[in-house]
From Swiss-Prot:
Main location: secreted
Protein name: Toxin Tx1
Transmembrane segments: none
A GO CC term attached to the entry: extracellular region
Keywords: Neurotoxin, Secreted, Toxin
Source organism phylogeny: Eukaryota, Metazoa, Ecdysozoa, Arthropoda, Chelicerata
Molecular functions per Gene Ontology: toxin activity
Family per similarity comment: Belongs to the neurotoxin 04 (omega-agtx) family. 02 (Tx1) subfamily.
Keyword Secreted: yes
Tissue: Expressed by the venom gland.
Cellular location(s): Secreted
Source organism of the structure: Phoneutria pertyi (Brazilian wandering spider)
Length: 10
């Protein structure tokens, strides 16, 4: 569960 999975903010 990576944050970037929901928040693609680099």
């Amino acid at each position: 569960a990576e944050l970037t999975s929901c928040f693609p903010v680099g």
